[in-house]
Regions:
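Amphipathic, non-transmembrane alpha-helical segments in extracytoplasmic/periplasmic proteins
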Residues: 62, 329-345
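N-terminal beta-propeller domains
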Residues: 1-95, 189-191, 394-525, 529-577, ...
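Beta-sheet repeat architectures centered on beta-propellers
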Residues: 1-61, 66-73, 644-964
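Hydrophobic or amphipathic alpha-helical targeting/insertion segments
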Residues: 113-180, 188-190, 355-359, 363-369
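Short linear interaction motifs
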Residues: 57-60, 111-136, 495-524, 569-580, ...
Length: 964
């Protein structure tokens, strides 16, 4: 046998579920409570600092807020929305509760100042009431934290733009002496409420075979016996009367579908059509009648169905006014016509406005003139129906009467303030729009025409059904202890009303109900992209106007502007219910449970005309999580199968599909299926995920140099308490932990040797969980009992190892703490300096079996020699900053051995400093076959432990076989 040695230069590649012989050198079986670093090696994870107790209720939606305030710097908060809809917010750094007030009144950004000093107007927010944690989704943009309830369907407000009265306007356009100015008035029939009475008439009638399918075999009856023309006159059926039509039954002799030998092989194939000659009155769509035995042939039956109806109105003359001008004074002409109307036309009132006449009535009417060159008339037209309140708590339907002109040139220069006109332009509805006259200073006469929304329709969004906001107000107050306390306002948002067009020319976004419906599609999530708010609902993506976040309607019905709202839909052959998204360089990545899409534009400006959506992936997505930014790439979890997977989407561009890599392949069956809570940090190249109410956090550490990934490691942390929310903000990891029906806030600083988290003056961190400090003046020494007592600054967990660490002249002194109630006791005198108290946690690394490895051929892949015989003599472990740690050797057929490595001995470090070795090589004797033992390295001590590398020595033979 040959004596050989081999070195694994680093152990930062994390856990692998592969067989040991396939593991890449540097991977391990288990890596618990570690933190890989490409520079510093495999570190013991940082301890967690106890911040404060938060609440006794863990249920609800938890979230965090991070914003940069130019006056106070980085502001960090954690919040909870209870199941009942109450909002609680704490400062992440201090744990102090912040002031939260409520408003039931929808607000806009311009109105925030009115609420700075407001008190509570409510104790709960109904929109926030929820049953499932993922029912509420949160998005923070500057001072606004938007909250979306996935179970609430958006709706329109019952408030409508007030319909105009029955009115008309006559503008004098020419003065012609000795020519009559004639106006004819007609009243349109209406009911007692003033609604236009409309009579329906059939405009579409269909016919079908009834009780047979148009095919008759010659065995059953004579060929084409049912053909003919059949007339129906003055027929009453359904809800109408007096319809006339005739039907034409045609026949063709064909070869039978079921020939028999008994008779001649012939059959009759019939077709039928209907021609409407009189639509009658009173019919409704769907009315039908069956006519039987046409032509005296039994079974020759047909069903006639009304498919469409039209409506007519009845007019009655109210009279005529006429003025034969013998003057060239327009004022005289107008005054004379106004006087004639008021004196002779019953129920109609007229007034002179500038160069025209404003006419109104309590009942619908029309006005016309035989000579349009003298006067231009803007008269009322029927513009459909609208729904309004009836004054008794209900609703009623009204006729929407709106004046109309064919083109903008017919609009008068002077008019009634507030007068609304529909400009038709052509026979197409798509180019119609509405304008409103705005008189100077709100007065009749001179003014301008401005585009407006169609009156009588729902143009206002119901704020109570839309996402609400938790708003960080500008004012900050101080509590009795001098701590800054922020003010937050919980309120619905005031969404801008539709200011132009109607349901066709300026439609609602997809998440709002279609016209005639009550409820829309629930908003699944909100995003922020290209200075727009983004709403995901079913397969639809809707965006606000650019920079005007609470405006979801277009600016004009005349043209599409670049900053108008965007409404688009993804296209897929499988259900694509969108759940979340992430901004990437190429656009906006949106994800559904089974597919990924890219919303983008090929133009510099994202607009309704330039938006494009492409399908770029078909991978399963865990909808309880969110897509994550990995620098230029995107990562996301999948929960298909028994275990979770983590995919990375690489090179997302507009001209080709991205490459998707499963980064969790090495972890195999390690990741739990129900991962739900995800925290990530691009600065620290770290992703942390866990199940809700679990104390185990799965971590993925990555690092790239150029296009090469040099670090891709999975490892796990175990914490005291179950995680209900966690987040990484800059270099700090925050976790809300539930233990014993108490939610507590802790923080771990991820950056090694960061001054803010360095507890000893030697730049070594103390690795306690839930650590807290006690000042020397708060320590009491009892000389008789030789005990030091103090009030515990942290929670007490009976099952955990509680210790103290001295920071004074005896730096590094460690003692066990006994607790009685809230009083902690240490043996000896500890009053010379401050102390840190906390709970030990165990760092554990389980090494894989050792095999001789070599690079294979030109491919350079690592290949393990599992056929040869290897007896390992010893293992030399190289460590960095390390104090107390243990090596546990489990051997087949032998007792387990635990080798303890103490801190450096006296004489090897400076007095009154922490006895921690900066670098050391420790030998672990093995003397066993490589497949017969397992080695673990652990540290359950407040001192650091850093693993650099491992080198094994042993005797090896290839058993005289050569690999080929």
């Amino acid at each position: 046998m040959t004596s050989i040695a081999q070195k694994i230069p680093r152990y930062i590649l994390g856990m692998s579920d592969q067989p040991d012989e396939l593991k890449v050198p540097g991977q391990v079986r288990d890596a618990q409570n570690v933190l890989p670093d490409v520079t510093l090696g495999l570190l013991k994870r940082p301890g967690t600092k106890y911040i404060s107790d938060l609440t006794t209720t863990a249920l609800g939606k938890w979230f965090h807020i991070h914003k940069n305030n130019p006056f106070t710097g980085s502001e960090r908060y954690i919040g909870q929305i209870t199941r009942q809809g109450q909002v609680l917010i704490w400062n992440l750094n201090t744990g102090l509760a912040q002031n939260v007030t409520y408003s039931n009144v929808a607000i806009s950004p311009d109105e925030l100042d009115e609420y700075d000093d407001s008190g509570n107007t409510a104790t709960l927010q109904d929109y926030f009431i929820h049953e499932q944690d993922n029912q509420l989704q949160v998005l923070t943009v500057n001072d606004y934290t938007f909250v979306t309830n996935r179970s609430t369907s958006p709706s329109m407000s019952e408030e409508v733009v007030t319909a105009r009265p029955y009115e008309a306007f006559v503008e004098l356009r020419a003065i012609a002496q000795h020519q009559p100015y004639i106006l004819d008035f007609e009243e349109i029939a209406s009911d007692d409420d003033g609604n236009v009475t409309k009579t329906s008439t059939i405009t579409g009638l269909s016919v079908s075979f009834d009780g047979w399918n148009g095919y008759i075999h010659s065995d059953d009856e004579d060929s084409c016996a049912r053909a003919g023309t059949f007339v129906e006159e003055d027929d009453d059926f359904g809800s109408g009367t007096g319809a006339d039509w005739y039907s034409q039954v045609s026949c063709q002799a064909i070869s039978p579908k079921d020939p028999t030998a008994a008779t001649a092989d012939t059959a009759s194939q019939y077709s039928v059509s209907v021609t409407l000659t009189d639509g009658g009155s009173g019919y409704e769509v769907g009315d039908s009648v069956v006519k039987t035995d046409y032509g005296g042939v039994t079974g020759n039956n047909y069903k006639f169905t009304v498919t469409s109806v039209g409506y007519t109105t009845t007019k009655t003359s109210l009279g005529q006014v006429s003025y034969d001008s013998s003057t060239s004074n327009s004022e005289t002409i107008i005054d004379a016509i106004v006087t004639d109307i008021n004196d002779n036309i019953t129920g109609v009132t007229a007034e002179a406005i500038g160069n025209g006449i404003y006419i109104t009535s309590s009942a619908p009417f029309t006005v016309s003139s035989p000579d349009p060159t003298l006067m231009v008339i803007v008269s009322a037209t029927d513009d459909g129906d609208y729904t309004t309140t009836d004054g008794a708590g209900g609703t009623t339907t009204r006729t929407n009467i709106v004046s109309g002109v064919n083109n903008v040139s017919q609009l008068p220069y002077q008019c009634k303030h507030g007068y609304i006109v529909r400009v038709r332009n052509s026979f197409e509805l798509e180019d119609d729009y509405y304008v409103k006259f705005q008189g100077n200073f709100g007065q009749d006469g001179d003014g301008v025409w401005e585009e407006c929304a169609k009156p009588g329709i729902k143009n206002l969004v119901n704020s109570d059904s839309m996402p609400h906001a938790i708003i960080r107000l500008a004012e900050t107050v101080e509590d009795d202890d001098g701590n800054n306390v922020a003010n937050f306002l919980v309120a619905p948002l005031k969404w801008a009303a539709r200011r132009a067009g109607d349901e066709l020319t300026n439609p609602r976004p997809h998440f709002l109900p279609a016209p005639g419906n009550t409820f829309g599609r629930p908003i699944q999530n909100m995003l922020f992209f290209r200075d727009r708010l983004v709403f995901l609902s079913d397969e639809y993506i809707s965006m606000s106007r650019t920079g005007d976040y609470f405006n979801i309607f277009g600016k004009s019905a005349l043209t599409i502007a670049g900053d108008d709202p965007i409404n688009a839909a993804v296209s897929s052959t499988v259900p694509a219910l969108l759940h979340d998204g992430l901004v990437v360089g190429a656009g906006l990545l949106v994800v559904s449970p089974n597919q990924q899409f890219l919303l983008r534009t090929d133009n510099d400006v994202l607009s309704p005309a330039t938006v494009k959506i492409t399908n770029i992936g078909g991978y399963s997505f865990n909808e309880k999580t969110k897509p994550l930014s990995l620098g230029t790439n995107v990562g996301f979890f999948s929960d298909s199968g028994l275990y979770s997977r983590f995919y990375e989407m690489v090179d997302i561009t507009v001209d080709r599909d991205p490459e998707v890599i499963e980064q969790s392949k090495a972890a195999g069956t390690l990741l739990p299926q129900d991962l739900e809570l995800v925290a990530d940090s691009k600065e620290n190249d770290l992703i942390m995920a866990c199940e809700r109410n679990s104390n185990e956090v799965w971590c993925y550490k990555y690092f790239n140099t150029g296009e090469k990934r040099v670090l891709s490691a999975w490892f796990r942390w175990t914490l005291i308490g179950n995680v209900i929310h966690h987040a990484i903000i800059k270099d700090s990891y925050y976790a809300a932990l539930n233990e014993g029906d108490q939610v507590r806030l802790v923080r771990a600083d991820l950056r090694p040797l960061r001054e803010a988290t360095t507890i000893t003056e030697d730049n070594f961190r103390i690795h306690f969980d839930y650590y807290g400090s006690v000042a020397d003046e708060d320590l009491t020494y009892n000389e008789t009992d030789n005990e030091t007592t103090f009030t515990m600054p942290i929670p007490v967990f009976a099952d955990e190892s509680l210790q103290a660490f001295s920071l004074g002249t005896e730096a590094g002194r460690i003692g066990d703490i006994t607790v009685d109630g809230t009083t902690g006791t240490l043996v000896g005198d500890w009053t010379d300096s401050d102390i840190v108290v906390g709970y030990n946690f165990n760092m554990r690394v389980e090494f894989p079996k050792i095999y001789p490895v070599a690079k294979s051929g030109l491919s350079g892949t690592i290949q393990s020699d599992t056929r040869g015989s290897l007896v390992v003599s010893r293992i030399n472990v190289t460590l960095g900053d390390s104090g107390y740690y243990e090596a546990k050797l489990t051997s087949l057929g032998r007792d387990d051995r635990t080798i303890t490595f103490e801190s450096i001995t006296a004489g090897q470090y400076e007095a009154n400093s922490v006895p921690i070795l900066n670098e050391a090589i420790r030998s672990i004797p093995i003397y066993d076959k490589n497949t017969n033992f397992t080695l673990e390295l652990s540290s359950n001590h407040p001192s650091p432990t850093t693993l650099y590398s491992m080198e094994w020595e042993g005797n090896y033979t290839n058993k005289y076989y050569r690999s080929v």
